[in-house]
Swiss-Prot record:
Record's subcellular location: Endoplasmic reticulum membrane
Family: Belongs to the glycosyltransferase 2 family.
GO molecular function, one term: dolichyl-phosphate beta-glucosyltransferase activity
Segments on the Cytoplasmic face: 28-327
Enzyme nomenclature, EC number: 2.4.1.117
Topology versus the membrane: Single-pass membrane protein
Keyword set, alphabetical order: Endoplasmic reticulum, Glycosyltransferase, Membrane, Signal-anchor, Transferase, Transmembrane, Transmembrane helix
Keyword Transmembrane helix on entry: yes
The protein's name: Dolichyl-phosphate beta-glucosyltransferase ALG5D
Bilayer-crossing regions: 7-27
Listed SUPFAM superfamilies: Nucleotide-diphospho-sugar transferases
Pathway(s): Protein modification; protein glycosylation
Length: 327
């Protein structure tokens, strides 16, 4: 009996060593994350992340941002993460402003803001945003102290959004901006039953309508990534990575205060949180075209794969938990 217990103890020890080794790999080689506590934003970078630049209103000072826990002040917030986007950002902003101003002209209750989160850009991205902010009092620049990743940029912007609805949208202009209306109509339906709701823009739900143009290799890589996404805990969503998603304000509070993954693979984590939280989630086809310069390196895909495994393991083992959090 003692011999059997000794052998069992050895097997258990080996299993724990293997699990520990796997966990160490996931924690060491994955993307940047916060592991066991609150989001990084208020804890590590309170001053630089909680202030915005708005020269049209306050030309000589940085002004404290509102947070997602304050009462909404506009109808919709467009959150735009930007890293070295000085060339592509102007076209995207022009199209977005034109659309939003048309909506405003038709409906005085349609109020908006654009928050561009400059993720430690090395080019003139911040200057481009400030040029627009000088002309429009509802365009804001939020500066990250250094490059922290797309997920961190979206997180920072959404946690300081003033809108009843919050749209994350890429700076490259790949998605037709007027498709916001499609997501808006859908989220209004979802909000009737649940204030925590998300509408995911999809490039693959309807290939013809989405006008998706991708190479064969990228399609194969996308298929492999989709399998890992399912393993991570995302079900029922065909396109998790489209940078065009609409959130209710209540959904933002829960999602972005519990987000850990800071770079490319944050989207699946948000959807895992939403599923575990039993949020209403819907997927809508949008018009999307692949933009030159928007491709991810192979090393980035490897990190994404590791992060997907990390999401799968850490949530299943309750290392990452979901709960009500505040600043």
């Amino acid at each position: 009996m003692e011999k059997q217990l000794a052998e069992l103890s050895v097997y258990i020890l080996i299993i724990f060593l293997i699990l520990g080794f796997i966990m160490a790999i996931l924690m060491r080689f994955g993307d940047d994350t916060t592991l066991f506590d609150l989001t990084q934003l208020p804890k590590n970078n309170p001053k630089k992340l909680n202030y915005y630049v708005q020269p049209a209103k306050n030309p000589n000072e940085n002004v404290p941002f509102k947070t997602i826990f304050d009462k909404p002040q506009v109808y919709v917030s467009f959150i735009v993460p930007a890293y070295n986007e000085e060339k592509r950002l102007p076209k995207m902003l022009e199209e977005t402003i034109e659309y939003l101003e048309q909506r405003r002209y038709k409906d005085n209750n349609f109020t908006w803001e654009i928050v561009v989160v400059n993720d430690g850009s090395k080019d003139r991205t911040a200057h481009v945003v400030l040029e627009y902010a000088e002309r429009y009092s509802n365009i804001f620049l939020l500066n990250q102290p250094h490059n922290m990743g797309k997920g961190a940029a979206i997180q920072a912007g959404c946690l300081h959004a003033r809108g009843q609805l919050v749209l994350m949208v890429d700076a490259d202009g790949a998605t037709k901006i007027s498709d916001f209306g499609l997501l808006e109509n859908e989220i209004k339906k979802l909000m009737k039953n649940n204030k925590e709701a998300i509408v995911v823009g999809s490039r693959t739900l309807n290939e013809d309508k989405s006008k998706v143009h991708r190479t064969f290799i990228r399609k194969i890589l996308g298929l492999g990534m989709h399998i890992l996404i399912v393993i991570s805990g995302v079900h029922g969503i065909k396109d998790t990575q489209c940078g065009f998603k609409l959130f209710t304000r209540d959904a933002c509070k829960m999602l972005f205060m519990n987000q850990h993954v800071q770079r490319w693979c944050f989207d699946p984590e948000l959807l895992v949180i939403a599923r575990r939280r039993k949020m209403k989630v819907s997927e809508i086809s949008v018009e999307w075209n692949e933009i030159e310069g928007s491709k991810m390196k192979i090393s980035g895909m490897i990190k994404m794969a590791i992060d997907l495994l990390r999401i799968a393991v850490f949530y299943r083992l309750n290392i990452w938990t979901i709960r009500d959090r505040k600043f």
